[in-house]
Amino acid sequence: MAYQLRQVSLPLLPAGASDIRILHFSDLHLTPRRGREIADIKSWIRLKPDLVISTGDFLAHREAVGVALNALNELLDLPGLYVFGSNDYHVPKFRNPLSYLRKDNGERNLGEKLPIEEFDTELRKRGWINLNNKRSLITIKGIAIDARGTDDAHLELDEYEGVTGEKKGDIAIGITHAPYSRVLEAMAQDELDLVFAGHTHGGQVRIPWFGGSRSLTTNCDLPNWRSRGLTRIANQPHLNVSAGMGYSPFAPFRIFCPSEASLITLIPT
């Protein structure tokens, strides 16, 4: 296994409910040359998830649509929810790695457009639900899940006002690619139970720090200490940020920050 599986249980379900296993992945950044990563993705079916959630950046190459669909093939037979990230819309372009340590000035150097409409169509054909500025009520093992999402906040495509409102069902979850504070605060105001995000790569390059490691950046306004894993502030929603599986073709490395997927098991309270 060339990645880390982050596993955690959360007591969010009503008493007497069956456990729900959620596979959360993000930032695959797939290209035709990512053979090891593709093999890891195909192995996830053995985790036997009840629900699959992707928080975007599936693609990193104009010929990656078929690659991604092949890698995800068996998972697409399961219930799935997804949103997109900036690299699903545009081919990555070179950026000075040191620029990630500076304050974001809002400028985006975008590459050529990717065939995201084709990819989106194929995902929906297989039954996965697009939550880019959309909301859906799904039922998993008898539990009604109010799921809402936003398009990529890094490109300012998020329109949470279109999905806001009192939560319905047994639990409410949010899905977004880049965990900007405006999105997280809006979801907290709606009293969601759990939010899934990606984008940060866990910092991608981390420094050893008192028995662990520390991120230097999140590439958004999320505090560095929340760059990966499950965290919570006071009574706000639990936030699971995936450090992701891949990386930009122009920065093909991870330092003290392994690729990862998350298996979150929702259990009764």
Can you name each region flagged by the protein language model?
Residues 179-262:
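Conserved beta-sheet core of the metallophosphoesterase superfamily
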Residues 24-26, 51-57, 80-86, 131-134, ...:
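Active-site neighborhood of phospho(di)ester-bond hydrolases with catalytic His/Asp-centered motifs
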Residues 19-29, 144-153, 173-177, 237-244:
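Active-site-proximal beta-strand elements of phosphoester/diester hydrolases
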Residues 36-138, 223:
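Core catalytic region of metal-dependent phosphoesterases/phosphodiesterases
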Residues 47, 72-77, 165-168, 187-190:
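Short, conserved loop/helix-junction motifs that constitute active-site signature segments
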Residues 1-16:
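N-terminal membrane-anchoring alpha-helices
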Residues 95-128, 134-135, 140-185, 251-254:
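Binuclear metal-dependent hydrolase catalytic cores centered on His/Asp/Glu-rich metal-binding motifs
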Residues 58-61, 86-90, 138, 152-155, ...:
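Solvent-exposed loop/turn segments at secondary-structure junctions
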